[in-house]
């Protein structure tokens, strides 16, 4: 049910841009939300705090869970006003409302060097396959009975059902995500994962439909720490871009305890600032998705000078879209049975929405169609998937191309396969992280068209959820080859040997799009120079003209090495002060400072990025960097959605505050008269991140269309979003 509701966020929400009608004055608030009960995570300043004494003043608050490994804190439940008061207690470091997390190889394993590295041996003369390395997976569970996973699975726990059986959800709201992730890491049968002999420990923190709470994910991290896993994979996340959320902090702690943590960067790209927690963790390895070079299908229409090629994206799990496929195209509206009466032996063009992809494909097949093209109901392209293979091929295309096809009504379309180079996937979330401007992702790996294990067999899926386990498998191989390596050394080896990718215009992607580039495992295993950190952020907190960043360089080789930083290319208004060349003896390390001076009069924007080059003899090593001259102008409020709630006649909303707000509110105005109708919600000192609430029907205005003014105030600045929402309590 939870997954269905999350999906419905985009299916049933009726949100339209509404033209501004002059300045709207928001009336003062009458307090009415303080009694709402919420769940939150409270972190303590000191380890010796008496938890019972802290909560004595707040009788409505009760302890739900105690965290002592991943975090020093508790999860609590109680009235919002008491939780707000608790934030002021000197013994409390932070209080964060619990949010929802969503579970967001055949050719990809050799592509990243997985096959090549199996030809190498460790000091025990063992082939590099991940043998003896414990990999934890926090996800929807695992089908440990799958023939390709039986040998790899060693144990785990079901946090959702509180037992030692982390099997995937079956029946209604069934899941497959965790099994797919596990196969990429360590399948050992018909398919072979990156590290086929690694030991898999599965922690089921995401329940039916593939969603779970902060609390359950934290419990899973605690268990993984207790089980002393070597590598921990989290192919999950939410849309909260902040470095200090509980899950991100817990991963930082796990890394400090010696666990190499890997997190997916999110599937909300291609815009900046779309990375979500736990991909925002400072010390974990955050992974974006690339599309390996391949021949990809395009449909062509027209003749001569009017000929046009349109990229299409085969739907994962559907019957393959074959090369040189052609046929007559007809408009099938949204794909309902009554709209497909002329579909026999035709390719049907249908619009996304109202019914599922599987239903559209099944309806077209029943009507005798030869294939289905589903175009987006908003701008841009998208990737789709179905869990049951249909009878006919199906693919997606962008909203713009779909509308154009519908308008021009071409008689025939033809399919051609075009070779495309390796690119960053459009859906892959971009950084940087708000607040600290850290570069994310750290690295990218294949995440498009990844075939792996699922409970019913095998399925090809897309997502950074598929990219992250490539890196987790790579970490397992590196740990087997070099068991003495720390998580920081594993991260450095992967990042300093990554290959930098270029876009279709042959320009290098920004560092906040690709991090250090795409992983090259066969190079990473040979690394013996390490950099801490492996990317640099220069932040101007006090409007200084000179910014600095520190870095430690370590030579773990058996001989002395000479290093030299090269000067970056000319940048107007920027002067770099690089360290002098230096030599490190074997097993020696050195701390360095890099400075840059800037003239704001010659700089047009607030964020700049690039790569520093270090020469180790004749070998080039690249370090991503980013500097912020002023606080970037990211939106103070974003991501507003308004949808039906969990209970009948209730509604729920969500919005995102990148930096928190001194005041946040949602004011409603009648659409026709623009008369003030009341506040949908209001909050003082709202925390940074995602806010999601259900509004009871008695708190809602009468049925009708309303203009919603969503605003956030902070440090004398106010940002607003204006949307039209529809309330219908009769549904």
Residue ranges of model-derived segments:
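Subtilisin-like peptidase catalytic core
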Residues: 162-240, 288-293, 336, 346-357
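Hydrolase catalytic cores
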Residues: 182-185, 194, 201, 205-207, ...
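Flexible, small-residue-rich helix->loop connector segments that border functional cores
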Residues: 117, 125, 138-148, 172, ...
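Beta-sheet-dominated interaction scaffolds and their linkers
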Residues: 136, 263, 423-429, 518-557, ...
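Structured lumen-facing ectodomains of secretory-pathway proteins
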Residues: 274-276, 280-441, 455
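Autoinhibitory propeptides
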Residues: 4-33, 48-124, 401-411
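Acidic-leg catalytic submotif of subtilisin-like serine proteases
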Residues: 117-165, 180, 184, 235, ...
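N-terminal domain-start motif of subtilase-like serine proteases
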Residues: 21-34, 63-66, 77-85, 103-137, ...
């Amino acid at each position: 049910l939870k997954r269905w509701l999350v999906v419905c966020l985009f299916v049933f929400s009726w949100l339209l841009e509404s033209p501004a009608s002059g300045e709207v004055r928001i009336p003062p608030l009458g307090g009415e939300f303080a009694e709402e009960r919420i769940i939150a995570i409270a972190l303590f300043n000191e380890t010796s705090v008496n938890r019972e004494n802290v909560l004595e003043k707040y009788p409505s608050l009760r302890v739900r869970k105690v965290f002592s490994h991943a975090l020093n804190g508790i999860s609590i439940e109680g009235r919002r006003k008491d939780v707000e008061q608790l934030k002021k207690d000197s013994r409390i470091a932070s209080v964060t409302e619990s949010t929802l997390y969503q579970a967001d190889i055949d050719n990809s394993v050799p592509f990243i060097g997985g096959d090549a590295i199996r030809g190498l041996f460790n000091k025990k003369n063992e082939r590099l396959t991940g043998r003896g390395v414990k990999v934890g997976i926090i996800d929807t569970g695992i089908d440990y009975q799958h023939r390709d996973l039986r040998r790899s699975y060693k144990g785990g726990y079901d946090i959702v059902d509180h037992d030692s059986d982390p099997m995937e959800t079956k029946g209604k709201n069934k899941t497959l995500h965790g099994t797919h992730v596990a196969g990429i890491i360590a399948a050992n049968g018909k398919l072979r994962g990156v590290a086929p002999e690694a030991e898999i420990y599965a922690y089921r923190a995401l329940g039916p439909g593939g969603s779970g709470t902060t609390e359950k994910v934290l419990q899973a991290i605690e268990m993984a720490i207790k089980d002393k896993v070597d590598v921990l994979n989290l192919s999950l996340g939410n849309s909260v871009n902040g470095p200090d959320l509980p899950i991100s902090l817990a991963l930082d702690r796990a890394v400090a305890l010696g666990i190499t943590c890997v997190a997916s960067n999110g599937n909300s790209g291609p815009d900046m600032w779309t990375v979500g927690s736990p991909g925002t963790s400072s010390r974990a390895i955050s992974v974006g998705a690339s599309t390996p070079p391949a021949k990809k299908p395009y449909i062509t229409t027209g003749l001569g000078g009017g000929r046009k090629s349109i990229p299409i994206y085969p739907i994962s799990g559907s019957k393959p879209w074959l090369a040189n496929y052609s046929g007559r195209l007809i408009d099938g509206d949204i794909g309902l049975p009554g709209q497909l009466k002329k579909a026999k032996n035709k390719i049907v063009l249908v619009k996304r929405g109202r019914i599922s992809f599987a239903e559209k494909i099944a309806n077209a097949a029943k009507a005798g169609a030869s294939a289905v093209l589903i175009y987006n109901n908003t701008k841009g392209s998208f990737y789709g998937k179905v869990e049951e293979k249909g009878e006919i091929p199906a693919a997606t295309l962008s909203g713009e191309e779909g509308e154009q096809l519908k308008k021009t009504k071409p008689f025939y379309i033809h399919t051609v396969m075009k070779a495309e180079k390796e690119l960053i996937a459009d859906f892959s979330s971009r950084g940087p992280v708000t607040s600290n401007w850290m570069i994310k992702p750290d690295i990218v790996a294949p995440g498009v068209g990844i075939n792996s294990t699922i409970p019913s067999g095998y399925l090809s899926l897309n997502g950074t959820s598929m990219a992250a386990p490539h890196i987790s498998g790579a970490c397992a191989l590196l740990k087997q080859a070099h068991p003495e390596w720390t998580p920081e050394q594993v991260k450095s080896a992967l990042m300093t040997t990554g290959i930098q990718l270029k876009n279709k215009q042959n320009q290098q992607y920004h560092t906040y799009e690709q991090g250090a580039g795409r992983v090259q495992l066969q190079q990473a295993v040979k690394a013996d120079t390490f950099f801490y950190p492996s990317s640099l952020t220069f932040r101007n907190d006090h409007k200084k003209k000179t910014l600095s960043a520190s870095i430690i360089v370590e030579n773990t080789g058996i001989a002395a090495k000479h290093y030299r930083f090269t000067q970056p290319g000319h940048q107007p208004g920027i002067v770099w002060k690089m360290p002098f060349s230096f030599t490190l003896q074997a097993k020696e390390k050195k701390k360095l400072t890099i400075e840059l001076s800037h003239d704001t009069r010659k700089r047009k924007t607030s964020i700049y990025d690039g790569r520093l080059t270090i020469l180790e003899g004749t070998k080039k090593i690249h370090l991503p960097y980013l500097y912020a001259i002023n606080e970037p102008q990211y939106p103070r409020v974003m991501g507003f959605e308004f949808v039906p709630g969990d209970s009948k006649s209730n509604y729920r909303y969500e919005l995102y505050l990148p930096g928190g707000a001194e005041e946040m509110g949602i004011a409603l105005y009648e659409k026709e008269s623009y008369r003030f109708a009341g506040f949908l919600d209001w909050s003082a000192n709202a925390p940074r991140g995602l806010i999601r609430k259900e509004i009871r029907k008695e708190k809602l205005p009468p049925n009708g269309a309303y203009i919603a003014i969503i605003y956030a105030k902070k440090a004398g600045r106010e940002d607003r979003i204006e949307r039209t929402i529809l309330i219908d309590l009769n549904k």
